[in-house]
Amino acid sequence: METKDLIVIGGGINGAGIAADAAGRGLSVLMLEAQDLACATSSASSKLIHGGLRYLEHYEFRLVSEALAEREVLLKMAPHIAFPMRFRLPHRPHLRPAWMIRIGLFMYDHLGKRTSLPGSTGLRFGANSVLKPEIKRGFEYSDCWVDDARLVLANAQMVVRKGGEVLTRTRATSARRENGLWIVEAEDIDTGKKYSWQARGLVNATGPWVKQFFDDGMHLPSPYGIRLIKGSHIVVPRVHTQKQAYILQNEDKRIVFVIPWMDEFSIIGTTDVEYKGDPKAVKIEESEINYLLNVYNTHFKKQLSRDDIVWTYSGVRPLCDDESDSPQAITRDYTLDIHDENGKAPLLSVFGGKLTTYRKLAEHALEKLTPYYQGIGPAWTKESVLPGGAIEGDRDDYAARLRRRYPFLTESLARHYARTYGSNSELLLGNAGTVSDLGEDFGHEFYEAELKYLVDHEWVRRADDALWRRTKQGMWLNADQQSRVSQWLVEYTQQRLSLAS
């Protein structure tokens, strides 16, 4: 039986971040994901790298300070999929007085180490404003946007770059301690093939399933309860042409974002609803749709109805149960629990956490694991660049360089490659000299060469992996085009299997 230094169960942002950090410190690492990378909470976020302005109201200064500092780090680590964005906050005096917002924004500007992002300012909305005429004043501040699912993917690629192993569609079925080691058993969810490994340490980063894996996978008591809080978003055709996002205050003291997305759409979200069901079956409720439309329509001149919605997505945040009364008051901070057996076979479990602070969470996890590994390397991720991030400049400059090297690329395709694959675009394009070298076009300039790259280098096995997580081509491809992608994947997988045998 093969022995690993560390097995990480869960292929969301926290699992991938911990696995990448550990592999880079010289540990032999295996990451197991039961379905697809980022298939649950990590692809259902608001897609922001943000300090969390509203968390200041709950006195979460440590969390906000850490998150603010991380924005600058992540912009450097993944400049192809993360970029700065300005946020406009319409002032509604009966909800929060201007002095309170000014204090909050002053703290937001100064709590974290801000080197590249501009500070906050006051605003007056004139006649040309997209907001209703009664909204005359507001504020503007900086945060960042990120492609959440691709941030997970880049970390998984880093695991492999640093010598680790990543298996998707491989479900960990049990883990037990034996003679100072973990015995981990898993099965391939497609073929039923069984695997087992030994490991010196184990990480439970299963997100919404963290407590369930304690109960069913390890038959151990979970050190903390978990509260599942559902967050849903609606997507509509772009509601305005400005680059800025809007952060809207609502009567219930919650906030809702309106975020420009992929040049053609706006994301509106999120909700905060206690959730008791199966995390895999999570979907938006009618009441959430009405809530989000109502908050939006209260603020904007351009009104929206249900018919404008082109897509919705929902996810559950697995938050550590701190017995708060309301979903929005529960801490978004993370809790790491570690325990061992006679100084060996540590189990580190992740409760809670945010996309923005995943790298610090991973660093803290490795601090807790370090005493169990002789000769483990030091922290290293703060100065690293994730796979695809070596674009030397900004994304649009890189897209222009791609077009010079591959003159047959349209502007839109070069931009898509630059903003999706970054410096890995050249691996995708290889020696292509004409557009016909890219193979079949499945629709919306989604060519065979891209899909082949996704299978060979990004763990894509099913159409959803390619169309809704590695890319968002599902927003444009119709049902027939999507089923052609599925068919191609089956044929290509069979071809690879016959070559391998």
From Swiss-Prot:
One of its GO terms (biological process) is anaerobic respiration. Gene3D superfamilies: 6.10.250.1890, Alpha-glycerophosphate oxidase, cap domain, D-Amino Acid Oxidase, subunit A, domain 2, FAD/NAD(P)-binding domain. There are two sn-glycerol-3-phosphate dehydrogenase isozymes in E.coli: one is aerobic, the other anaerobic. Pathway: Polyol metabolism; glycerol degradation via glycerol kinase pathway; glycerone phosphate from sn-glycerol 3-phosphate (aerobic route): step 1/1. It catalyses: a quinone + sn-glycerol 3-phosphate = dihydroxyacetone phosphate + a quinol. It is found in: Cytoplasm. This is Aerobic glycerol-3-phosphate dehydrogenase. Conversion of glycerol 3-phosphate to dihydroxyacetone. Uses molecular oxygen or nitrate as electron acceptor. It comes from the Bacteria. The keyword Lyase does not apply. The lineage of its organism: Bacteria, Pseudomonadati, Pseudomonadota, Gammaproteobacteria, Enterobacterales. It holds the Pfam family DAO. Its EC number is 1.1.5.3. It comes from Escherichia coli (strain K12). Its cofactor is FAD. Belongs to the FAD-dependent glycerol-3-phosphate dehydrogenase family. GO terms for cellular component: glycerol-3-phosphate dehydrogenase (FAD) complex; plasma membrane. FAD binds at residues 5-33. PROSITE patterns: FAD_G3PDH_1 (PS00977), FAD_G3PDH_2 (PS00978). Keywords: Cytoplasm, FAD, Flavoprotein, Glycerol metabolism, Oxidoreductase. One of its GO terms (molecular function) is protein homodimerization activity.
